[in-house]
Amino acid sequence: MATASFDSAPGASRALPAIEKAPEVTALSTLPGRKASLVGLTREGLKQALIGIGVPERETRMRVSQIWHWLYVRGAREFSEMTNVGKGLKAQLAEHFTLDRPEVVTEQVSRDGTRKWLLRMAPTGAHDHNRGAEIECVYIPGDDRGTLCVSSQVGCTLTCSFCHTGTQRLVRNLSTAEIVSQLVVARDALGDFTGQMPGKDGGEVGRLVTNIVFMGMGEPLYNLDAVIDAIAVMSDQEGLALSRRRITVSTSGVVPQIERLGLEANAMLAISLHAVRDELRDELVPLNRKYPIAQLLEACRNYPGLSNARRITFEYVMLKGVNDSDADARALVRLLKGIPAKINLIPFNPWPGSKYECSDWERIERFSEFVFNAGYASPVRTPRGRDILAACGQLKSETEKLRARARMMLEEGMGAEAVYADQVD
């Protein structure tokens, strides 16, 4: 069953600065008559849910603490599991709410152990044809960590020319609960909640998911309210208990929101740079036409908490004959002078219809060596999950295809039900 969010739509509580207006797309309210899920809620959202069913406000702090533990430490799927919650309250909760997660439409496992989930969110009405928006998230296991790549939007507005997600139009922002629920789904699938596997004590030690990267579908800083609240839930030490130093938010360069991200989320920052000249970055990352490289790097220099211990990661996709020359490497080092940084070199991951090729391995190594010798860590990101289109730049949900088919059928006088009856998962 898909998750129905009780959280208010992103952007409802905190206005963006006038200089930067996010796209007018939000997570719409739950369908009438549908129970909302408590999974993914903030503490305040959970408090308001309890008040809404008649729990006295003086009791809410204790009740929120109890339920929070079952949601985010134990991973409860039924209210009956909540042994320290009174029978009457459990009955009330079951009457009004669920503990549903997003529906797992498909799970693919790569030869290298990477997992990709296609998740369907709760339906919100005509906006998504009563079916529910679809997004992807990816789990990447490593020797000393496990990284979950989460999405912040359904689709993307940025149309970066090398990115598969950029070929899918933006449908809407995800709510806080929909972002957090991606971590809940991953922990469910991996048996990563306390009590599900031996040695799980609620802390980071022994966890399979140790790191979160906002590098899935969408531009996180265009949905910053929801992202900040999601990070607060993920890093709450009485719940999901991730360290904020293990949460990284990647942006293509929404300059006016970068400082606020640092002040309110205190997360690690990654920049999708990919070029050292404005004319090339204008093509690769069209947002550069609004916020050129000089403005972006100035915002990076002023990022709250920036230090050698909290470096900014600059992502640089290696495109054959496009941005991979010795001159590009020298220019990159000059641009980043004075910024505590590391540079992630990303071998381009091909996807159907792309016009780019990955740089030769020898060229990538030469580029990396030049940057390293200039004093910057320059790891080459090992491509993971390429065989299931789960690697960097390859994510794309089925939503865009569904919307196109819906428009076509509606033009032919067919209802939305026909679209989904015809869709084979």
Swiss-Prot record:
Gene giving rise to this polypeptide: rlmN
Q: How is the cofactor bound?
A: Binds 1 [4Fe-4S] cluster. The cluster is coordinated with 3 cysteines and an exchangeable S-adenosyl-L-methionine.
Described function: Specifically methylates position 2 of adenine 2503 in 23S rRNA and position 2 of adenine 37 in tRNAs. m2A2503 modification seems to play a crucial role in the proofreading step occurring at the peptidyl transferase center and thus would serve to optimize ribosomal fidelity.
Q: Name one GO biological process term.
A: rRNA base methylation
> Which GO terms label this protein's molecular function in UniProt?
4 iron, 4 sulfur cluster binding; metal ion binding; rRNA (adenine(2503)-C2-)-methyltransferase activity; rRNA binding; tRNA (adenine(37)-C2)-methyltransferase activity; tRNA binding
Q: What is its EC number?
A: 2.1.1.192
According to its UniProt record, which protein family does this protein belong to? Answer: Belongs to the radical SAM superfamily. RlmN family.
Protein's organism: Methylorubrum populi (strain ATCC BAA-705 / NCIMB 13946 / BJ001)
Main subcellular location of this protein, as a coarse class? cytoplasm
Cofactor(s) in the UniProt record: [4Fe-4S] cluster
Tell me, what's a Pfam family for it? Radical_SAM
Q: What is this protein called?
A: Dual-specificity RNA methyltransferase RlmN
